[in-house]
A protein has these predicted regions:
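Short, functionally critical alpha-helical segments immediately adjacent to catalytic or ligand/cofactor-binding
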Residues: 19-35, 80, 123-126
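Extracellular cell-wall/glycan-interacting regions and their flexible linkers
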Residues: 1-25, 135-161
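Peptidoglycan-targeting cell-wall enzymes and recognition modules
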Residues: 1-15, 32-117
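Active-site or metal-binding loop neighborhoods of secreted/extracellular toxin and effector enzymes
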Residues: 107-157
């Protein structure tokens, strides 16, 4: 089920600030080998989906069940956005979101999304959320540079001529 990068950018624009879209999209491009397929499986590994969920996979499927959602590109983006932006905890101070990245990681990603350059967003998201065994950072940064040429078009891709 291949999705075009513009469709994924449109989904990201519903949950992330404009500043973050190209950096996250670049990470997805590398994670999926350019397919942008939310069912993409890692070759010889456990990774799955747009973000190649590895350790996150059981948390993701629990999130789907709890929220009554089906697996989809949008559900994966929603799960990622929840992990980044959900700062809620219970009365004892235990984190209540679907995936606990840790407060410092969440804050670093949020700050990068709001204030960082495309390169900063790309690196921070890779290091604090994706946590790949092989970062391929040069490839991520090159992809971000390519997507950055279209920055500003991602907020409402359906309005393109």
């Amino acid at each position: 089920m291949k999705s075009h990068s513009l469709a994924i950018a449109g989904l990201l624009s519903q949950y992330l600030p404009e500043n973050a879209i190209t950096g996250v999209l670049a990470n997805i491009a590398v994670e999926t080998g350019g397919s942008f397929d939310y069912t993409q499986k890692q070759k010889n590994g456990p990774g799955y989906g747009l973000f190649q969920f590895d350790y996150q996979k059981p948390y993701y499927f629990k999130y789907l069940e709890k929220e009554g959602l089906n697996d989809s590109a949008e559900s994966q983006v929603m799960f990622m956005a929840d992990a980044v932006y959900n700062n809620k905890s219970d009365a004892e101070g235990n984190y209540t979101g679907a995936l606990d990245l840790g407060g410092p990681a969440r804050k670093a990603i949020q700050k990068s999304f709001n204030e960082g350059s495309t390169a900063d967003v790309t690196k921070t998201f890779s290091e604090k959320y994706e946590k790949p065994s092989k970062p391929n950072m040069d490839e991520r940064l090159k992809s971000a540079e390519d997507f950055d040429k279209f920055k500003g078009l991602f907020t409402n891709p359906l309005s393109l001529p």
